[in-house]
């Protein structure tokens, strides 16, 4: 059996067409794009032949933000983020200048739903790559959405901005 793995781009977040908001914070959140991709990374050309763009990032603007507010980014009906093969890692670039956040990915598939904690970042100006490597690879999963929980809000007036870029998975056969 081969141990070869490949990284596949699920979304480069150049537009918001594939996503909608859900969860407790959806009514306080606006989804848009911003002319800033993660500058500290070089856009990759992934195993599926898709090249990541770095012109725009997906942005969640949260009004009246407070600690423990949760916003979900879910795939729009008819939009599929199927992961062929065995999921070995999920990665996401994140920048959150106004709040500390915790991010997780929600997966579905033959074996039911599960949530993978991608990680936490403190409020700051820099892009950071979050990721999760499950103990055992997950076969034939679908990425259903991302959950973002604000853990500490440092900006008290206006909207809290959370930027997302290049959602990728590493798969094995």
Locate the predicted segments by residue.
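Beta-rich carbohydrate-recognition modules and glycan-binding surfaces
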Residues: 1-173
């Amino acid at each position: 059996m081969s141990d070869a793995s490949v990284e596949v781009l699920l979304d480069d977040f150049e537009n918001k067409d594939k996503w909608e908001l859900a969860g407790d914070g959806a009514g306080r959140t606006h989804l848009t794009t911003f002319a800033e991709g993660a500058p500290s990374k070089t856009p990759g050309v992934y195993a599926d032949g898709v090249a990541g763009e770095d012109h725009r990032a997906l942005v969640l603007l949260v009004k009246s933000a407070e600690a423990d507010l949760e916003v979900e980014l879910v795939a729009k009906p008819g939009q599929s983020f199927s992961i062929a093969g065995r999921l070995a890692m999920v990665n996401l670039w994140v920048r959150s200048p106004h709040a500390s956040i915790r991010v997780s990915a929600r997966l579905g598939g033959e074996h039911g739903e599960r949530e993978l904690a991608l990680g936490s970042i403190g409020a700051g100006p820099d892009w950071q790559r979050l990721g999760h490597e499950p103990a055992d690879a997950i076969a034939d999963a679908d990425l259903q959405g991302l959950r973002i929980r604000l853990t500490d809000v440092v900006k008290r007036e206006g909207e809290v901005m959370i930027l997302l870029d290049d959602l990728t998975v590493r798969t094995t056969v």
